[in-house]
Amino acid sequence: MSEIRLYVTTTEKKSEQVLDLMTPVFEDEELPIATSEIDEKSDIWEASIYLYADDEDDVRARFAALLKPAFPELVIKKEVIPDVDWIAKSLEGLKPVRAGRFLVHGSHDRDKIGSSDIAIEIDAGQAFGTGHHGTTAGCLETIETVLASRRVRNALDLGTGSGVLAIGVRKLRNIPVLATDIDPIAVRVARENVRRNGIASGIALETAPGFHSTAFSRHGPFDLIIANILARPLIKMAPQLVAHLAPGGSVILSGILAEQRWKVLAAYNGAKMRHVRTIWRNGWVTIHLDRP
């Protein structure tokens, strides 16, 4: 069944206000909603809802009814999300990646798993995160370090992508993990990868933009939060992220270019977090912080 995106183009402030209007109406129906920046200099943002094409008329009508009282000038636009077989396109030449004891591999490399490896099977697909990017590998290394040295009873993987980091946590420690992403395609891919790795019962998957979901209060607070996204949203959501962290908990942040690390550290130092370690990989950094 084909998927579409209905969206409005506006400013950052108005996009957040639109999101606040949409959340109580669409959240219980598991229709993903999100805001995204289009042009920083011009303050152009989009507020979107993702749905199946068969539901367009109903959702469009309710979306329009929400907008009309407060934002009658906003026009609902439509984007058809293409069905692309990224797995078939991406598998060729994809080699296993080692990060600490983890070995991230595709289904075509199962014969390369060693007896002491913690194997995570992820085929390249429509969601980010096969272990080949420096940020994913840096997160896996840091996950291993944190779980070996800290008492961790539950974890959050914010912006899960392929689910590789949530799977890594669950393979190392038998604890509940909440994995979220704003992209419904990513959540679908992550759910398949979790099933493929045989740990479906331990990972809860939710489509959620930022912290706009009741799932965080239901499953949190968290002893470990992993967020491999981008520097700008990491900085913006620092107070919210730390608010969902249990006392004494740990945070792993990535998706950060080396030159952006000081701004990210400043945001989390301001939120009373303590810097523990930074891992550098191919121009990207992964930052580990603890809450005192």
Curated annotation (Swiss-Prot):
It comes from the Bacteria. The keyword Cytoplasm applies. InterPro entries: Ribosomal_L11_MeTrfase_PrmA (IPR050078), Ribosomal_PrmA_MeTrfase (IPR004498), SAM-dependent_MTases_sf (IPR029063). One of its GO terms (biological process) is methylation. It catalyses: L-lysyl-[protein] + 3 S-adenosyl-L-methionine = N(6),N(6),N(6)-trimethyl-L-lysyl-[protein] + 3 S-adenosyl-L-homocysteine + 3 H(+). S-adenosyl-L-methionine binds at residues 136, 159, 181, 228. Methylates ribosomal protein L11. PANTHER family: ELECTRON TRANSFER FLAVOPROTEIN BETA SUBUNIT LYSINE METHYLTRANSFERASE. This is Ribosomal protein L11 methyltransferase. It comes from Rhizobium rhizogenes (strain K84 / ATCC BAA-868). The lineage of its organism: Bacteria, Pseudomonadati, Pseudomonadota, Alphaproteobacteria, Hyphomicrobiales.
